[in-house]
Amino acid sequence: MFSTRTALTSLRPSLAAARRPQRHIPRRTFVSSTIHNLSEGFLDLAIALPWPPEWPPYSCTIILVTVVTRLAFTVPFSVWAKNRQWRAENIVVPQLKQEMPSIHKQVQQDMKRDGFRGDKEAVIAEINKRSRVVAKERRSELLKQNNCSPMPTIAMPIITQLPLFVGTSMVFAEAARAPTVLDSEAFFTLTSLSHADSTLTLPIMLGIITLANVESSKWFVSAEVLKREQEVAKWTAERRARGEQVLQPSKIYQTALRILSVGRILIAAMVPGTVQLYWVTSATFGLFQSWTLDYWDMRRRQRHAISEKQKDSA
């Protein structure tokens, strides 16, 4: 009797070890230890959650963790940035446009006081040159007054999202490191969560979703923004016709994102299935987030335009 109980007791650690293979960490640092502990916590969470028996628990937990972390850590900053962008486009730009006649008038007075001489074309060129300098300074003042400077608006979402994205990718990659229980779970075209998708379906989906996010950014653009872009394009063409070199940051940014869409396919093809699933889920969430925020912004612009017309008519 005692020997039987002893034998059963000795089997329990081996059964636990079979359920959770022990992985050797060559060199423990604070980062590697934290990543390892988080990956173990993820595996425990997947088993603890009450998923239906027919659902793959680890894959569903990856999707759930992705959605929850995006909702908690990225959506608030994206809304914050969208509000700042809205103030810049609907408060700063109209006010600056309203002040441009007075800026031109002040520049002409300054030129008369300075005794500027030249033909008509030279005078117009000088007025435009000085007006651009004054308008740029005034724009910076208005952006600061309305708390919508472009640099924090662009940088804050990147600063908050990038560490989360990299850290979560490292956690899921660590969870897929052999030996792991993820070997036995398949999902979609993944024969195993610990191996890359041999069909390249998920990496290609990732590239398509990323490209769709880039190209769909113009779907909800207002008529004022389109008109302003056309004016900028015309102004750029005129400057290039005169032999000037003009850089367009927005087009450079769009081109870089398109290249990134292709690059993500190549990178995603080399990472484990857990990371591929996380990246595709995160990109899909980001696409719907962009659509939702852009639609919300479009509706807000429409309401703002209606209220402005009502004020003018009153």
Indicate where each model-derived feature is located.
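Transmembrane alpha-helical insertion/packing segments
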Residues: 13-14, 29, 33-37, 58, ...
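Membrane-water interface at transmembrane helix exits
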Residues: 81-82, 169, 173, 177, ...
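Membrane-interface amphipathic helices and adjacent TM-edge segments
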Residues: 73-161, 226-261
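Interfacial loop/helix-cap signal at membrane boundaries in integral membrane proteins
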Residues: 29-61, 182-197
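Hydrophobic alpha-helical transmembrane segments of multi-pass integral membrane proteins
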Residues: 60-69, 131, 135, 150-174, ...
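N-terminal mitochondrial targeting presequence
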Residues: 1-39, 314
